[in-house]
Amino acid sequence: MLKSIRTAEIILSALPYIQKFRDEIFVIKYGGAAQIDEKLKNNFARDIVLLQLVGIKAVIVHGGGKKINSFLERLNLKSEFIDGLRVTDKDAMEVVEMTLSGLINKEITSLLNKHGARAIGISGKDDNMLKAKSLDDGKYGFVGEITDVNENVILTIINDGLIPVIAPIAIGSEYETYNINADLCASAIASKLKARKVIFLSDIKGVLDKDEKLISKLNETSINELKNNGAISGGMIPKIDACLECIKSGVGAAHIIDGKIPHSLLLEIFTDEGIGSVIK
C-alpha cells in the first residue's frame, strides 16, 4: 500500500508541469549513448510516448556520429573534426546521408512506433524543409549552415498527431546535399517553431565548470566566461552556441542533459530540480 501511495504522489508531482506544457512544442536533439545502448533507446522511446500522451508536441532531431564513424572506417574513409564539426567531403557525404536518413532515422521511427507512438521519419531534404549553404566558405567540405526552415512541413506533421523524426540533412541552392550538425539543426528548427523548449541529450551531465561541477542555470554572460576560461571547448562549443541562438530567437529555454541517465528526459521536464543545465 505504501508503495502504491508513493507511486501516486510521484505521478501527481508532475501534474503542474503537464498542465503548463500541454500543447507546447519541444524540440529534442537525440544523440550520444542514449542512441546506442539498447536499454536507453527503449527508455527514450517510452519517454517520448508519455510526452505525446500528456499533450506535449515533440519534434526529434537525431545525430548519428558513432555509426557514421563506423561506416566510414569500413569504407576506409577518414574522419576529421575541426571546431567540433565533422569535415565532410563528397564521398563522406554519401555515407553520412545514407547512415542518417536511410538507417538511423528509420530505426528511431520504428522503435517509437513499436512503443505506441505515432512517428514519421523524414530528411531535411524532403519538401525542401531544410535549406542550407556551405559553412565558412567550404572549410568543412559539405557541412552546411541552415539558411531557412520550412516550418509548415513540420507543423503539418504535428497537427496530424504525429511525431516528426528529422535527419539533419539539408539541400543547397543548386540542390547539393549538406551535412548539418545535429545540435545546430535542432536549434534552427526550435527557433523557427518558437518552441517552448529545446533539449539536447548528450553524454555529459550538462555544462560543467573547470572543476567539472555541474552548472544548473546559465545565461549568455556566464557562458562567455566559461568559454574564456576554457571550461567550454571542443565539441561543446557548437552545442552551447546552438542553445544561445535558440534563446535569442525566442525559444523559452534550452536544456543540456545526460542521456546516459535512464528517463533523463522525464526527470528534466517533470521535476523541480531537473538533472542537467538550463540556459535562459
Swiss-Prot record:
Main location group: cytoplasm
- GO terms, molecular function: acetylglutamate kinase activity; ATP binding
- InterPro entries assigned: AceGlu_kinase-like_sf, AcgluKinase_fam, ArgB, Asp/Glu/Uridylate_kinase, Glu/AcGlu_kinase, NAGK-C
Residue spans making up a coiled coil are none
Task: Spell out the subcellular localization from the entry.
Answer: Cytoplasm
- What's an example GO cellular component term for this entry? cytoplasm
Q: Which Enzyme Commission number(s) are listed?
A: 2.7.2.8
Keyword annotations from UniProtKB, A to Z: Amino-acid biosynthesis, Arginine biosynthesis, ATP-binding, Cytoplasm, Kinase, Nucleotide-binding, Transferase
Fetch the CDD domains from UniProt. AAK_NAGK-C (cd04250)
Q: Which reaction does it catalyse?
A: N-acetyl-L-glutamate + ATP = N-acetyl-L-glutamyl 5-phosphate + ADP
Q: Report the pathway entry.
A: Amino-acid biosynthesis; L-arginine biosynthesis; N(2)-acetyl-L-ornithine from L-glutamate: step 2/4
Which leading EC class covers this enzyme?
transferase
The UniProt record lists the keyword Transferase: yes
Q: Which GO terms describe its biological process?
A: arginine biosynthetic process via ornithine; L-arginine biosynthetic process
Q: Quote the record's binding site residues for substrate.
A: 64-65, 86, 179
Instruction: Note the site residues: Transition state stabilizer.
Output: 29, 239
- Function recorded in the entry: Catalyzes the ATP-dependent phosphorylation of N-acetyl-L-glutamate.
Q: Which PANTHER family match?
A: N-ACETYLGLUTAMATE SYNTHASE, N-ACETYLGLUTAMATE SYNTHASE, MITOCHONDRIAL
Protein family according to the UniProt entry: Belongs to the acetylglutamate kinase family. ArgB subfamily.
Q: What is this protein called?
A: Acetylglutamate kinase
**Which source organism does the UniProt entry give?**
Campylobacter fetus subsp. fetus (strain 82-40)
